[in-house]
Amino acid sequence: AVDMTYAAFDYAQQDRNPVLILSDGVMGTIMEPVELPPERSAEEVRALKEQCRSWAAIGHDSYKEPRATIDAGRWDTKEQERHCKKAEELYKSWPSEAETLYLDDAEVVVTGYGICGRIARSAVKLLRAEGCKVGLIRPKTLYPFPSDVFAGLDFVRVKAILDVEMCIPAQVVDDIRLAVTDRCPIETCLHAGGEIMGRDEVRSEERRVGKEC
């Protein structure tokens, strides 16, 4: 979470586009030791400021150069369409990110985002210690969604995917279905309304899914 928050500012400045940090309530309240990225030098900070001098409203001599403007759209429809195509190319350039574990021999793949991703990772490591052939996909970006990671699974071996979410009804399961395209069953392990997911629940659901598939 710390690394992604740090990177969000770079992405926002690079593309002049808002970046949403989708932290959940648990991630926003826990305390734990973290390792911060290296501090940038004064020269690096000056270079970053200089990059945005031509377009940002920095408060000094901004009247001397045209600044970025925001409007509802363009009256010329062809120009608006060109702008939309340019934006599409920008969106395609954004990398998707996901943490993966033990996918080389997994028969059941557990997935979760936010705090559920961390809980799922802990459960998967315990299950592996018990001899279960289980893997993990933990999406770090939800847009773009790491569809290629799900689509690239070996569906001859993978019997099912278990989606862990603190959300009822599940939301990310729809993105998973689009990536998997009915090549294996997708089960859910859900909580909502303030109920916190536990790793023992995830372990129990994984065992159930593994037996049924």
Where are these regions (language model features)?
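Conserved thiamine diphosphate
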Residues: A1-G25, G198
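Redox- and metal-dependent alpha/beta enzyme cores, enriched for Fe-S-associated oxidoreductases
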Residues: T100-C132, I137, Y143-V149
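Conformationally flexible catalytic loops at phosphate/diphosphate-handling active centers
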Residues: R16-T100
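Buried hydrophobic positions in well-ordered alpha/beta secondary-structure cores of metabolic enzymes
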Residues: Y6-A8, V110, R138, L162, ...
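Glycine-rich beta-alpha junction loops
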Residues: S23-I30, G114-C116, I168, G193-G194
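Peripheral docking tails and interdomain loops at the edges
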Residues: V164-K211
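Short acidic, glycine/serine/threonine-rich loops at helix termini
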Residues: M4-Y6, I30-P37, S41, V173-D175, ...
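Short, solvent-exposed amphipathic alpha-helical segments in soluble enzyme
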Residues: Y6-Y11, L36-E39, S122-E130, A151-F155, ...
